[in-house]
Amino acid sequence: MRRIAIKLSALAQDGLTYGADAYDLDRYRQLSQLAAELFSAVSGRPAEELAVELGRDSGYATPKVDVRGAIFDDAKRVLLMRERTDGRWSLPGGWADPGDSPSSAVTREILEETGYHSSAVKLIACWDREIQQNPPPLPVHVYKLFFLCRPDGTVQPPAALETLDVGWFAMDGLPPLSLGRVNHRQLERALAHHLDPALPTEFD
């Protein structure tokens, strides 16, 4: 039902972007409201709140892009940052900004959230957030790009706005994860690519 709501929302957004007839535009606005109500039934969030969130986008509806950067040290520990929003831990990352290439987006996020200067050396995976079962359900379709990155040795204080803490963790001693951003399987796949860079990029 969530996928139906997302598809209805995308159709409404496209219609509001390219439609010209006043009656059609009104129907597309009604369709957008129905999509918000349907997603509300799935997620438990208020339909009014979802309608505002869905109405922020304009133009042809496309998936949003989330980038995540995995950095490992010689002891196979992974660099994680503690999210201010939920107090849990994640690979550094976030929404890609317009004007950023995927690799520059992920290295910018790593710098802002951990203080580490780095370079992206490999695309680990392009995953569909829903297929990967990253909770909670969102009212938009999301592609998640995971990169293997390498620090260049330069470190500065991270941006306090988003980050509570930064740390290195062994895979058998991971802290509570912010599962909407990264799950255990995704970290395991990132480590596999760190250990064997010849592995092919994964995708859904």
Label the model's feature ranges.
Residues 45-49, 100, 196-197:
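Juxtamembrane/interface motifs at transmembrane-helix termini
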Residues 51-90, 118, 122:
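N-terminal strand-loop-strand
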Residues 96-120, 127-186, 203:
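Unchanged
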